[in-house]
């Protein structure tokens, strides 16, 4: 024999889940115990409706008088209608009737009627009275004792087998219940059998039911299986739970109940309590009121209309017509007695529910769902087993407004008839649907291969765009959110479309994954708003948030610029605390030389500022602190004092003061403060990270040069930030000046390193990356390397001093601007002129002859002009290399690639031009 199992009960299932043999007795006992509520919970009786007590009283009065008569009538009818062949099959080899046989639908029949041969005490112990049957009752049935023969296929409803009585004609509104509830109560493979059984029982059971009612026959225990007046006793629940757990079944519904609580109306143990279907409340009524429209499903809809298949392969989702949220809420639902599910219930439906492993590897929250609108009604307190309750997220108007501003288009225009969700059959259902249209069919390319434009949204089977679904509906309907679309070649073939294992109604959403196109870099963004560059919308504006944050390079002046402590005022030209003020005075005036024990990059903060005096002093110079700033302040006070005493007579003391002042100013001019700042902020040595143990190759050398350029660019930004007057420029002008002049600055600094380190015989890019003749040829930029080496040799021929180099390098920063000008062009011109004057002052400091000073100024400015053509050639070379980088396997760091792709084309096209001192 075989017994079909469900979640904690006996009901028809597909033949894959069967247990044979020894479990028959255990299941028979479990079923009888479940049917006996027991009188142990008096509070459960008080929780039942008033109609339940009246029904129980009538059944108790009629049970003792007419139980015997009913069983005799059933035996007579069975003997009259049973054919001789069936009687022969029912007899065993020893002549005794078989204890069990197959029912009309092929399911096992488990008889539960009391035998006439049993004593009267056994008959009085009925499940409706709350007493527990004797343990030997179930055992006797399995040992071949005489038992009641089941009814033939065309018998009335009272003699139906107990397994079918759970889902057969006694279950109200089976044909009109929602598709989700149908999948819970009976799988897709057994739904047709139950519907046929229901149609037969409706036609045949009406006459027998009227005859039984006229004769006063009570309803049997099978008819009232769902109509108990009390909850399950503790023993029954514990026994059912133990058996279910031992067999791998889930009884989550029982775990949520405490003694005395009522179960949900759609639960398998919930009592209907004899209330007519017409007066039962409709759980989906609040949903219909919330949506503002009623679904026009009629109560007399046939089973074929309500069991329509959606376009999903295999028919996994049935009866979705008019149920955009898994709810069959209609105006006539109350009168038809339909058992409905609230909108917040969402099923984990699978095409392979028999495999337990199907649930273990699923990610139920990895689907791009979105909701914008009023939230559904709150979930009920106790969910059914296999139904998961989720509280939907309400993004409200803020989410709707944000979605409307999405770069993929206005979402308000996407709410059409095709956006009502899968299988929305009526126009009212489509209008009242809450399926969000954030991801349209044309945007499927962002999340996977698009399945074409097939999809119909019309009719009862519209499944969405790209699904090849049935029904010629609106083009471009919204595709279901939870599945992968078929390949391009299989877009129109429904047989090749694999339906999702899990379908989510609109009431479930966990997170909304936003699209991340691969063309947009994840770490970098644009710097400029005026030029989109060859990559479309990709700009470099947000690059400062990752690599060059403007807040980092230009912090607010509220704390000490050296250690970050609270600043006490402006000391020696910078906003510092008292401790750093005293330290700088002693360190700058003293003759002690500080050396860093590390790599000149020690952290200087409030707690570690005394660890490394060398790095602290260097940071003071970078902040602009100089001893001359204090002297200039004194000179300013002295000048004001002289103006106040202009009316007084001249005295010998005043003449002496004027002589000291003039000599002091002349001495100050020969030792400019500007040089002290430039020496302090000059960047240190930067390594390229090149592996010199590997053989030289074009890709390796150029990749190392690009990496070195990225590292040096960061130092250039820090150096420019520390230049006097640079912070007074507009922020956009600051970033533009750095982006346009970075190549010339690096070439000029590399030429100086080559002159000081290798006497201009090689190109000293970095200590670990020095180019000789072989590497110049290997890098395929030999002509550019020759010009850079010639620039390095100019430093030796002209005998450039370190002071002249520092001033020329600072002036080179302000030597290239856009043709249209900067945002604050006037201040830029003034700042550039000040740096030119500083260069002239440095020249005049060493030379007393004006003719010699003019000649020197001419030589230095010609050297500055010679840097611009070299930088332009390197701009062209790097831009061409970036375009072919994927072909030659040359790596470009993010920041370098952004600047080369966005700013270099402006220089090459003539929108940005250098400022020359001499006519070219």
Curated annotation (Swiss-Prot):
Impact after mutating residue 751 to D: In AIS; loss of androgen binding
GO biological process: androgen receptor signaling pathway; animal organ formation; cell-cell signaling; cellular response to estrogen stimulus; cellular response to steroid hormone stimulus; cellular response to testosterone stimulus; epithelial cell differentiation involved in prostate gland development; epithelial cell morphogenesis
Cross-link for Glycyl lysine isopeptide (Lys-Gly) (interchain with G-Cter in ubiquitin), residue positions: 846, 848
Region (Interaction with CCAR1): 592-919
Regulation: AIM-100 (4-amino-5,6-biaryl-furo[2,3-d]pyrimidine) suppresses TNK2-mediated phosphorylation at Tyr-269. Inhibits the binding of the Tyr-269 phosphorylated form to androgen-responsive enhancers (AREs) and its transcriptional activity.
Effect of residue 783 to N: In prostate cancer; somatic mutation
InterPro entries in the cross-refs: Andrgn_rcpt, NHR-like_dom_sf, Nucl_hrmn_rcpt_lig-bd, Nuclear_hormone_rcpt_NR3, Znf_hrmn_rcpt, Znf_NHR/GATA
Site feature (Interaction with coactivator LXXL and FXXFY motifs) residues: 721
Region described as Modulating: spans on this chain: 1-559
Domain NR LBD: 669-900
Effect on the protein of changing residue 766 to T: In AIS; loss of androgen binding
Effect upon mutating residue 785 to Y: In AIS; loss of androgen binding and of transactivation
Residues reported in the UniProt entry to bind 17beta-hydroxy-5alpha-androstan-3-one: 706, 753, 878
Role description: Steroid hormone receptors are ligand-activated transcription factors that regulate eukaryotic gene expression and affect cellular proliferation and differentiation in target tissues. Transcription factor activity is modulated by bound coactivator and corepressor proteins like ZBTB7A that recruits NCOR1 and NCOR2 to the androgen response elements/ARE on target genes, negatively regulating androgen receptor signaling and androgen-induced cell proliferation. Transcription activation is also down-regulated by NR0B2. Activated, but not phosphorylated, by HIPK3 and ZIPK/DAPK3.
Disease: Androgen insensitivity syndrome: An X-linked recessive form of pseudohermaphroditism due end-organ resistance to androgen. Affected males have female external genitalia, female breast development, blind vagina, absent uterus and female adnexa, and abdominal or inguinal testes, despite a normal 46,XY karyotype.
The name this protein goes by in its record: Androgen receptor
Organism: Homo sapiens (Human)
